[in-house]
Amino acid sequence: MLKRSSWLATLLGLLTVASVSTIVYAIELDEATRTVPLESSGRTVVLTPEQVKRGKRLFNNSCAICHNGGITKTNPNVGLDPESLGLATPQRDNIEALVDYMKDPTSYDGAESIAELHPSIKSAEIFPKMRNLTDEDLFTIAGHILLQPKIVSEKWGGGKIYY
């Protein structure tokens, strides 16, 4: 009985400490870091800390299975790094262009639709993880993609040497 009581007291003590302790899981990103390209004309947008968190969560739940670390598992020559996004046709290096891609993806050269092969809103019946994503969700995912090179630099889209 004494062992059980001391075990319960220890457990309650740990739970009490855990409930009153403040644990920081992420770094605070300044406004300059959270500023990403909005459209091809050069306009930018500052992501809120909430959008940053939500974008990361949605990316990890919906995209990371194939794009973990900014790579593309099915085509290691094309990643989500700024250079690859900028060389795509049309360029996919801003939020509006990435949202457009997530709605109706095209090949890297822009010549044909790949909606039946790549998860998208257009092919949500085939790829269920895309079914419930709103335009705001797509916005935050795109923001996450564009923010990562500022946080992890060349690791984002860097491939096997980093992940």
UniProtKB/Swiss-Prot annotation:
**InterPro entries reported in the protein's UniProt record:** Cyt_c-like_dom, Cyt_c-like_dom_sf, Cytochrom_C550, PsbV_cyt_c550, PsbV_cyt_c550-like
Q: Does the keyword Flavoprotein apply?
A: no
User: Its domain of life?
Assistant: Eukaryota
Which membrane topology term applies here?
Peripheral membrane protein
- Key word Protein biosynthesis present: no
Q: Which UniProt keywords apply?
A: Chloroplast, Electron transport, Heme, Iron, Membrane, Metal-binding, Photosynthesis, Photosystem II, Plastid, Signal, Thylakoid, Transport
Residues annotated to bind heme c: C63, C66, H67, H118
Q: Which PROSITE patterns match?
A: CYTC
Q: Name one GO biological process term.
A: photosynthesis, light reaction
Q: Name one Pfam family in it.
A: Cytochrom_C550
Q: Where are the transmembrane segments?
A: none
Q: Quick one: a GO cellular component term?
A: photosystem II
* Cited NCBIfam families: PS_II_C550 (TIGR03045)
Assembly information from the UniProt record:
PSII is composed of 1 copy each of membrane proteins PsbA, PsbB, PsbC, PsbD, PsbE, PsbF, PsbH, PsbI, PsbJ, PsbK, PsbL, PsbM, PsbT, PsbY, PsbZ, Psb30/Ycf12, at least 3 peripheral proteins of the oxygen-evolving complex and a large number of cofactors. It forms dimeric complexes. The extrinsic subunits in red algae are PsbO (OEC33), PsbQ', cytochrome c-550 and PsbU.
The entry's function note states: One of the extrinsic, lumenal subunits of photosystem II (PSII). PSII is a light-driven water plastoquinone oxidoreductase, using light energy to abstract electrons from H(2)O, generating a proton gradient subsequently used for ATP formation. The extrinsic proteins stabilize the structure of photosystem II oxygen-evolving complex (OEC), the ion environment of oxygen evolution and protect the OEC against heat-induced inactivation.
Q: What is this protein called?
A: Photosystem II extrinsic protein V
Organism for this UniProt entry: Porphyra purpurea
